[in-house]
Amino acid sequence: MVNIRPDEISSIIRQQIDKYDQGVQVANVGTVLQIGDGIARVYGLDQVMAGELLEFEDETIGIALNLESDNVGVVLMGEGRAILEGSSVKATGKIAQVPVGDGYLGRVVNSLGAPIDGKGDISSSDTRLIESAAPGIISRKSVCEPIQTGITAIDSMIPIGRGQRELIIGDRQTGKTSVAIDTIINQKTEDVVCVYVAIGQKAASVASIVTQLEEKGALDYTVIVAANADEPATLQYIAPYTGAAIAEYFMYKGKATLIIYDDLSKQASAYRQMSLLLRRPPGREAFPGDVFYLHSRLLERAAKLSDALGGGSMTALPIIETQAGDVSAYIPTNVISITDGQIFLSGDLFNAGIRPAINVGISVSRVGSAAQIKAMKQVAGKLKLELAQFAELEAFSQFASDLDQATRNQLARGQRLREILKQPASSPISVEEQVAIIYTGINGFLDEVPVNKVKEFVSQLRTNLKNSKPKFAESIRETKALGSDAEELLKSAIADVKQSMG
């Protein structure tokens, strides 16, 4: 007969109990009621948060946007072709966030921060919420430093400051993206981190921008966030917020950042598509009622931080595409009212060969001369007025047959001023050279130069100042003002060029 030892049995049972460790997981799980057009209706997610990430059985991620009494409206961040009616959905307990870090510089990523340039994984040191609160009033400082675009017409008449939001608006094919890309290229010596967000663009267009930045050596300090035209509307909708989160990482580290949203019209269209599919009530132009908030909460994140927070800044250049120059449409008026000014690019000027095609009459910077160095204020003060008077006289002179000498002189000067503001793409001009060029035009030194020779004159003047009179640029860089010594050097350079051109 087997000898039973109760104490041994009880010790074995005790050991088994001690080892027993079944982790109990409480998951918030729902069931798919309906799926289609990138939208899922889910039943049973009672504890879900607005904007929470949900995971479907095929590992597709969605965002809970509509919380209704009997179901949840979820937008998918992927194709979701394997999701079936009746399949389960799990709440992750997380709000959409994106990895951030210095490793993102020089890379192309998608709306979720994953690399799409084939250069391998990105090591990230941190994560940031895609939607985060904008800095408050106490956290901010008024805009006081310029961000030089390298485009003479903008830096002189529509100056942009660090922490400002300046809208670039115009019809298709008027050079909006060129202005933004030139601004990125001009930051090479300025220690500014740039983020370019491409929304709903062709993959070929994004590839050409990457190549252009690489050729100019500007990709090293730039992050490109791309949500191409073939991607789901959800990814096009969150791309700008992802870009803002990456820029904020650098801003809160005390760096100056520049972010370009190209373009917010396509983001609004993607949001309209999502909202209509979620059956939210449509408003003007079929946009949902909160489309203003869509853009205001994004653009309010641009700021110049106070010294206590490190003094970093985020300058935003949103781009909006108009239809046939109609700036009074819904989205353009919304964004104009949110931003601190706009640069209006005109199709007529572009076709007339005036490039950049900036319509100076309705372009404005609400920060004004606070975002300019003293030297630029000294020379550019009269420029906008002169050009406005010239435009008026030019329209009038088409009907008048005989004009007095003063009017003819003003027209001649206006033509030369317009000529010096023309600038090819991807060729930014330093602020010292801009000051020299505007000084030459505004003080009548070009009045005797034939209009077709103005470009050559300006080119020779820049070469002369760079090679023979480097002290001119040094003086402006150090003092930020056009002193009497610098002015004498400039006058002597102008005289040299006039002599050499005969």
Curated annotation (Swiss-Prot):
GO cellular component: chloroplast thylakoid membrane; proton-transporting ATP synthase complex
Keywords: ATP synthesis, ATP-binding, CF(1), Chloroplast, Hydrogen ion transport, Ion transport, Membrane, Nucleotide-binding, Plastid, Thylakoid, Translocase, Transport
Membrane topology note: Peripheral membrane protein
Ranges annotated as spanning the membrane: none
InterPro entries linked to this entry: ATP_synth_asu-like_sf (IPR023366), ATP_synth_asu_C (IPR000793), ATP_synth_asu_C_sf (IPR038376), ATP_synth_F1_a_nt-bd_dom (IPR033732), ATP_synth_F1_asu (IPR005294), ATPase_a/bsu_AS (IPR020003), ATPase_F1/V1/A1_a/bsu_N (IPR004100), ATPase_F1/V1/A1_a/bsu_N_sf (IPR036121)
Localization per record: Plastid, Chloroplast thylakoid membrane
EC number(s) given by UniProt: 7.1.2.2
GO MF entries: ADP binding; ATP binding; proton-transporting ATP synthase activity, rotational mechanism
Binding sites annotated in the UniProt record for ATP: G170, D171, R172, Q173, T174, G175, K176, T177
Residues the UniProt record annotates as site (Required for activity): S363
Coarse class of the protein's main subcellular location: plastid
Catalysed transformations (reactions): ATP + H2O + 4 H(+)(in) = ADP + phosphate + 5 H(+)(out)
Keyword check for Lyase: no
Family: Belongs to the ATPase alpha/beta chains family.
Function according to Swiss-Prot or TrEMBL: Produces ATP from ADP in the presence of a proton gradient across the membrane. The alpha chain is a regulatory subunit.
Known partners and oligomeric status: F-type ATPases have 2 components, CF(1) - the catalytic core - and CF(0) - the membrane proton channel. CF(1) has five subunits: alpha(3), beta(3), gamma(1), delta(1), epsilon(1). CF(0) has four main subunits: a, b, b' and c.
Record's protein name: ATP synthase subunit alpha, chloroplastic
Organism: Rhodomonas salina
Gene: atpA
